[in-house]
Amino acid sequence: MAAVCAASRVLGTKILSCKSLPAVCQANRQLHFSIYGKRGDAKISDGVSNQYPVVDHEFDAVVVGAGGAGLRAAFGLSEAGFNTACVTKLFPTRSHTVAAQGGINAALGNMEQDDWRWHFYDTVKGSDWLGDQDAIHYMTEQAPAAVVELENFGMPFSRTDDGKIYQRAFGGQSLKFGKGGQAHRCCCVADRTGHSLLHTLYGRSLRYDTSYFVEYFALDLLMEDGECKGVIALCMEDGSIHRFRAKNTVIATGGYGRTFFSCTSAHTSTGDGNAMVTRAGLPCQDLEFVQFHPTGIYGAGCLITEGCRGEGGILINSEGERFMERYAPNAKDLASRDVVSRSMTIEIREGRGVGPDKDHVHLQLHHLPPQQLAARLPGISETAMIFAGVDVTKEPIPVLPTVHYNMGGIPTNYKGQVITYKDGQDHVVPGLYACGEAGCASVHGANRLGANSLLDLVVFGRACALTIAEIDTPGEKLSPLKPNAGEASVANLDKMRYANGSTRTSEIRLNMQKTMQSHAAVFRTGDVLKEGCVKMESVYKSMDDIKTFDRGIVWNTDLVETLELQNLMLNAVQTIVSAEARKESRGAHAREDFKDRVDEYDYSKPLQGQVKKPFEQHWRKHTLSYVDPETGKVTLEYRPVIDSSLDAEDCAAIPPAIRSY
């Protein structure tokens, strides 16, 4: 250990002595960015650690994450004249946005008459009336312009014969406020829409003078007196620590699917932004709502897009029955994802699953023309062959619900500003924004509609940039930062680097994932959730006995995975405790011991004569969760759902009703 510490000091002394940053890889990589961004603005600081080199940077804005939301926010800010840094642990085109398949919703009306208000209605209904209707109004009204903007950026959308953007059917989408049949609203690039969107946004970002700090792992927010003043990050390439001081910080770090054993998420989906906010003493919102995508490949968990069913694919049980006709007579296989996942689970439970163990169902595509499969679903055809050994033109795909998306996240308003709830009012956290899957506006409520996620990314990434441009002016003088700001983050990094317990990071992570998978699944019960809370408390405490093996600082993936596990753990405990506390079934949160939705009124009956339940006695409200990082103890509070649209005359709010498809 002494030798390692000495090596760290040598690196620190070398950087400190030269008083200017080495041009790491700028000459070698020949990319559009400098690894250290605008080097003239960077200064060496010795106020945090003598062992770890600490470099200070000043920007108007810093964006954490470079997926769809992060890129859209970053180049939107640069376009508006803000000196912007984008800090990302991955090269931008490696972000998980690249894995999205199905498409992006917008009421363009290319296939039939459509209206964004019908999209608004479907999204509110899909959220099981937990979505904030002002934010849903904003997103759905902005959707057509957002898609046209992407087209102007060069996104190669699939086309109809007459050259318009092709739009496919997707789950939970209807015409005429649910009374006009299935809508075709999902704009797509075959079944690789996320790939095209991410590369389009990345290509667009090259037009602007944004400083990209690639393969930098964000550790924590720099908070002072309730205001966010930037972030502190680890440069994984050389082990130096960087403090990014900025008047505006945008979190776009994605979801935390890797808290579960079977999921469609990349291994980098570790909820880093949620965890940073939690450690800053701020709440996360609605983390109990975890979406299980109906069609993950059995045994692998790889995503099979909902677009398969949008193109005409059907789900089949062991009796050869198209069973969704029983559960959703109108929408059938294109009911919302929570409905389809529960229906599949019931079929398997009741003995109508397929395979030797009758533990999954089939997705049938071979009745569709091969030309259609080749043109509209080329990626799925390849994925099914690689991961299931299935030729989709001849055989069905074995599928099973798998964790796919987190409806909850960092609470924001529709402008992207992070909020807290005190004294019956929402309060903006100065200098802090969130968007994408990390944020919770809340446009998805208790259940996200397919193809609303990519829309969420571009609309609210742009909204963050617009809000900052409206409030601030580029080049404003920054308030001073305490010399030791970020000291606790560096101390934690050092502690994890030299952790010498008896349990590997991978072992603790697996215990967490299996606990979450078995205790917070598609169907939940009070006893199982309580047992899960107890087990997660034990798993959380086991972090005190963690052991890391790599004592280096350059590309120490053991250290980074351990820091990611800390982040996952904070997300996991909030998820399962929030789920145990919510005594109802709503959207993706299905309780077998509380099967009904508990609203302020019983909306299955006439409202006349009913007495409104007090806020404390119903569950149509957002969960706000706080964690003590030292103990893992979770504290819950609640805030009301926003039931009004942005303009009642232009778009009437949708009152709660019984949700059926």
Swiss-Prot record:
Pathway: Carbohydrate metabolism; tricarboxylic acid cycle; fumarate from succinate (eukaryal route): step 1/1. It catalyses: a ubiquinone + succinate = a ubiquinol + fumarate; (R)-malate + a quinone = enol-oxaloacetate + a quinol; (S)-malate + a quinone = enol-oxaloacetate + a quinol. GO terms for biological process: mitochondrial electron transport, succinate to ubiquinone; tricarboxylic acid cycle. SUPFAM superfamilies: FAD/NAD(P)-binding domain (SSF51905), Succinate dehydrogenase/fumarate reductase flavoprotein C-terminal domain (SSF46977), Succinate dehydrogenase/fumarate reductase flavoprotein, catalytic domain (SSF56425). It is found in: Mitochondrion inner membrane. Gene3D superfamilies: FAD/NAD(P)-binding domain, Fumarate reductase/succinate dehydrogenase flavoprotein-like, C-terminal domain, succinate dehydrogenase protein domain, Succinate dehydrogenase/fumarate reductase flavoprotein, catalytic domain. Residues 1-39 form a transit peptide. Keywords: Electron transport, FAD, Flavoprotein, Membrane, Mitochondrion, Mitochondrion inner membrane, Oxidoreductase, Transit peptide, Transport, Tricarboxylic acid cycle. Flavoprotein (FP) subunit of succinate dehydrogenase (SDH) that is involved in complex II of the mitochondrial electron transport chain and is responsible for transferring electrons from succinate to ubiquinone (coenzyme Q). SDH also oxidizes malate to the non-canonical enol form of oxaloacetate, enol-oxaloacetate. Enol-oxaloacetate, which is a potent inhibitor of the succinate dehydrogenase activity, is further isomerized into keto-oxaloacetate. This is Succinate dehydrogenase [ubiquinone] flavoprotein subunit, mitochondrial. The lineage of its organism: Eukaryota, Metazoa, Chordata, Craniata, Vertebrata. The gene is sdha.
